[in-house]
Every structure is written in structure tokens, then in C-alpha cells.
Amino acid sequence: MDLQLTGRRALVTGGTRGIGRAIVEVLCEEGAAVAFCARDAAEIAETEQALAGRAGTATGSVVDVADGPGLAQWVTSSGDRLSGIDVVVSNVSALAIPDSEESWRASFEVDLMGAVRMVGAAMPYLERSDAASIIAVSSVSGREIDFAAGPYGAMKAALVHYVQGLAHQLAGKGIRANTVSPGNTFFTGGVWDQIQQGDPALYATALGLNPTGRMGTPQEMATAVAFLASPRSSFTSGTNLVVDGALTRGVQL
């Protein structure tokens, strides 16, 4: 199925690792012009080189999402360079799990306010798009209490609430807003790779909770994001798409 993303203009935060990198890859494969950001210049250059020659384009910038003015400037400059913005993907997380004031502040500034500021800066461009889509990457930790309860889970839950509010506020303007909540996702160098090495008992417990017997991949999460980004999902808004291999037990009403 053609997702009709060819020529669409997308912004992705945290686009050099894990789920964010996979999102940039999938959007490029579908023909989108992607602007992505991260904090490491070397990783940005490697990502750009790896994606050269795809159907779409990928251009990276060094941005710290916790820097509000810097984030807004990147969104504006990217929108001007691309002559518009159709898709916004707020993917970055501080991954601040310890229950400390520092973690709470980091989660608030990066996970929640990073999304709020990104959407605010992109709004003038989204309002001019004929297929605007806002996507925030949340987590199953925002839906159920698990080992990441505390700042990480609380801010991921807040993201779902914020984005569903956007969906209702912006529906009349033709702008869709959704969240994707990944389950445990394994990739080299990621959180679960680190847990597997440092706390194999916790890793085994987490793996055993999933009926599929495995963790998800960044590509599986990115595919869900790409569908919500595409005009093919034109009537999907205000939804929290859980992609977890039946990990969570709660019924989402």
C-alpha cells in the first residue's frame, strides 16, 4: 500500500538511535523529506550518510530538545527550508527513571515540554498543510504501572492526555494528533540491551511478561508511526496506538 508520503515534509526529534532512527528511515523509504535532530554531531553525520540515496531525504541538525529556544529555532528553520511541515514526530525522551527531583525536571522539560514546544513552533506550518499529522511517542509505561513508574511513566501518560486534547482542538483545522505507545523495544545500545547486560534477572522477567516471547523492534514501532503520519490514516485522530505484542493487560476504553 502506498502511504502517500512522497514529498511530504516531516520533522523528527531524536533521529539517530533506536525508534527515532527507525522512524527517519521508514519515512525516507516512503519518499518523505525528513529533518531530524539529535545532540551528537557524529551520529547525525552517520545517519545522513546511511540514508543517502533513499526515496526521500534526511537532513540532521544538532539540537538539545531541553533547550526551548533552540528547539523552536530548529523547527522554524526546517519549516522554511522544506517550504512547509506536514508531519511532526516528538520522539525524544530523557529516559529519566529514578525517582529524584532531577529526573522529574528532566522528564518534564524533555518528554513533555519538548513535545509542547515542538508542536507550538510547527503550528503555523501545520495549519497550511493539507494533511497535517502530529505524533508523540509515549510508552506502555504511561498506561500501566511498571518498573518505570515515576517521572518517566507520569510524563508519558501526560503526553497521551496532551495529544488527545490537541486532536479535539485541531480537528476543525484538519490537523490530526495521535500517540504511539511502544512496549519493550530492544536494539543494540538501547535501554533493554543495557538491562540485559547489567541486570539479566530484570531482563528475563520483562521478556517473560510478553506472550510473544520477545521484545519489539524499532522498525515495528516506526511502521506504526509512519501509518499515523500518512494521509492513509486520515480519519485516525485522538488515538493512542499501543504497539506492545499484547504485553499490557488493561482494556483501553
Q: For each predicted feature, which ranges?
A:
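Alpha-helical segment proximal to the catalytic Tyr-Lys
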Residues: 124, 168-169, 234
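Active-site helix of classical SDR
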Residues: 119, 155
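Short C-terminal tail/terminal secondary-structure segment
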Residues: 226, 237-253
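Short, small/polar-rich loop/turn modules that mediate ligand/substrate recognition or access, typified
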Residues: 171, 176, 236-238
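A glycine/serine/threonine-rich, flexible loop-to-helix segment
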Residues: 172, 182-209, 250-253
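Conserved glycine-rich cofactor-binding loop
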Residues: 9, 16-17
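Residue(s) in the substrate-gating loop at a strand-loop-helix junction
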Residues: 139
